[in-house]
Amino acid sequence: KAEELLMTEFITSKNSGSKLIHESEKISGLVKILKTLHGAKLFYRNFNMFTYIYHYMNILKKDGLPKLLVPILNRIDHLGQRLAFYRTNLVPCHNDLLAENIIIRDNQLLIVDFDYSGNNDPCFELGNLSVEMEYDDEQINKLVRSYYGEINENIISRINLQGVVSDIGWSLWSYVQAQN
């Protein structure tokens, strides 16, 4: 099986840590970076977490799906159908915004590790970020206001749902990694 390899320069930096990304100005700074990314030329591939969820579920079913996941995964099709409506305006996304992929160099935030990048609903990106950083309602409102210019309850609902999808997908990824 052929592997793709990309080598880049080493960036001397420190990990941002999820607590640092809770600060209001850091949320605004990160949103500025994301809006630049989301406004860039489309990537050559799309990213759909549901594709990964089904893939990971199939791997896990071979050894028995963890019982704790069964009730959640029984509803994943319904959630996917509801969110499919929003997959029409895809933008370039990172799709894996855990704290380890957000670093600080010379007091500047940088996003690294684009192996799951692809075109996606920007609300998935914001939902993924909000879950990984464990944002509370106030911080999610700050995120939405910074990104969209206003608080919109429909957008907040989409971000929260996409955060659940992200959490399910990356949790399944963790289960798969633990089995290997």
Regions found by a protein language model. Give the residues of each.
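Short, intrinsically disordered, charge-balanced linker/junction segments flanking boundaries
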Residues: 1, 179-180
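ATP-binding pocket architecture of kinase catalytic cores
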Residues: 1-48, 58-59, 63-71, 85
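A general structural signal marking secondary-structure boundaries and capping sites
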Residues: 34-45, 83, 133, 151, ...
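An alpha-helical support segment within catalytic cores of ATP-dependent transferases
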Residues: 42-95, 105, 151-153
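Start-of-helix signal in alpha-solenoid helical-repeat scaffolds, especially tetratricopeptide repeats
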Residues: 157, 161-164
